């Protein structure tokens, strides 16, 4: 896209300005720059932050809500494309039917405008491996759900330094 991340960037960001990449091979992909980018035929990778809370009632204060945690979820969906490294991995039998640590992978999610984002581990939860109507492109959907709290990521210092 010919965009160079800049710590001084100010302005609008588009959905296309965000990169989601996962590590699919620990032996060959030792740096984030070698991880597989989620892009080809992907229509959406929407991020959401799902907070956990508890409510307690106190005398004279009333109900108080305490935030106890936050889980990052990236909802990915698009058209099926056999041969795309991201789709081939997330739609593999191992991931579709896997459980526990077998479906947990390192990920990075950041803005190409600022270079800032997050990195951590996430569970890959395939919610649809083939969808669509007659004569329409086949579709897929997968949720990328962070395990624990991701770390802050800065492309300018973590990758290019």
Regions found by a protein language model. Name each.
Residues 1-77, 121-138:
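Solvent-exposed edge beta-strands and adjacent loop segments
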Residues 41, 80, 145-148:
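Secondary-structure transition/turn motif
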Residues 119-161:
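Mixed-charge, glycine-accented linear interaction segment located at domain edges/termini
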Residues 59-121, 151-161:
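Extracellular/virion structural assembly segments
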